[in-house]
Amino acid sequence: MTRATVCVVGSGAREHAIAWSLARSADVVVTPGNPGIGGVAPSGHTIRSDPKPPQLLDASLYVIGPEVPLVEGLADELRAGGRLVFGPGAAGARLEGSKAFMKQLCAGAGVPTAAWACFAEPSPAIEFMKSLAPPYVVKTDGLAAGKGVLVTSDLAEAAADVAAKLSGSAFGGAGRRVVIEEAMAGPELSLFAVCDGTRALPLPEAQDFKRLGDGDTGPNTGGMGAYSPVPSAGDAAVSEAMGRIVEPALDALSRSGADYRGLLYAGVMLTPDGPKLVEFNVRFGDPETEVVLPRVTGDLVELLAAAAGGDLRPAAAEAACTPDAAVCVVAAAPGYPEAPRSGTPISGVRAAGTLPGVTVFHAGTRRLDDGTLVTAGGRVLCVSALGSTITAARARAYEAIARVGFEGMTYRRDIAEAAAKSEVT
């Protein structure tokens, strides 16, 4: 696909990272994009943002970043117009759009996951929780931007959360049904698989940090940082998770008539009984993308185009990755995740990006008419760094984020800390 143009749909740090990676071998247009997306890549290919909808942009390949347009059927619409699309249609996107659907599909496919039940009324949900040992896991059935999960050992808190979700006061229609799960124990793994409808090819694994505060304290967020690879997992765990979780689910989707051509992201718990599924997402994870894609050394355009075309095999070698590690740290606005403050001037982004191996991906930013860069969302920037080890990558990421500043900026100081310590013990 020489001098191809790829259209990326989305506006966050994930889409910035996807565009940055694709621009090694193609011109990239991102819709609607953000102020950080633009310019000329080292390869000579251009990257630009464009507010026009993807249906009005001419491209050789379309890559859909966020889950909402996938669930709403954007991939189907583009394919109906003869476009080559990396992203599942609405039938496959139900895997993330409804946790109850996901659980039912997994049960039929024999995918190991936590015991569960789905409820639309508080009383039976609370009675079910009483039958479980704490901690209790309460999830919205629908999309909640990664914030619809409560894990607590307090039954009263869990019951109040169920009531808030089912009433619609917490997450609107997304919470009109809740999934209650048995808690699982073990380290978590984010596993990305590029799928062509029948085959799946893993990308480098990652681990993310969902809680706002150090030591996994505070509320759940969309993700405050990540690292890759995950030494506690290893190739054997990834291979087992692919065989027990990803491949059976993809086969079940195929048998149901869903031609799943896109990214299947499995959140996996490495339990004493082997890997078990926490949940599926139908797109690249954020912030994991910001550490996974910098490690991919192959031609991402060729890889995603092959999957979109229905046959990964000719491009399988393009999933190759560097042995180097990557660590990213998210800078969040004050008030995140409940009520983030916007409009605060940001400094130091360019200085951070001049450090070796560092890339600053924009998430929630906006540029004023006078050129000032300001905050425009909860997660504002994602600072990603490559290094020969997790320790080295982590040091670079934290050196870089220390150069960035805006009033009330918050970030975790312990991203990849345990993994870095494990390298020297």
Stretch-by-stretch model annotation:
Residues 1-91:
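ATP-binding N-terminal substructure of ATP-dependent carboxylate-amine bond-forming enzymes
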Residues 152-288:
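Internal nucleotide-binding/catalytic subdomain
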Residues 242-264, 281-355, 368:
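Active-site "cap" helix and flanking loop/linker of ATP-utilizing ligase/carboxylase catalytic domains
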Residues 365-370, 374-425:
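Generic C-terminus detector
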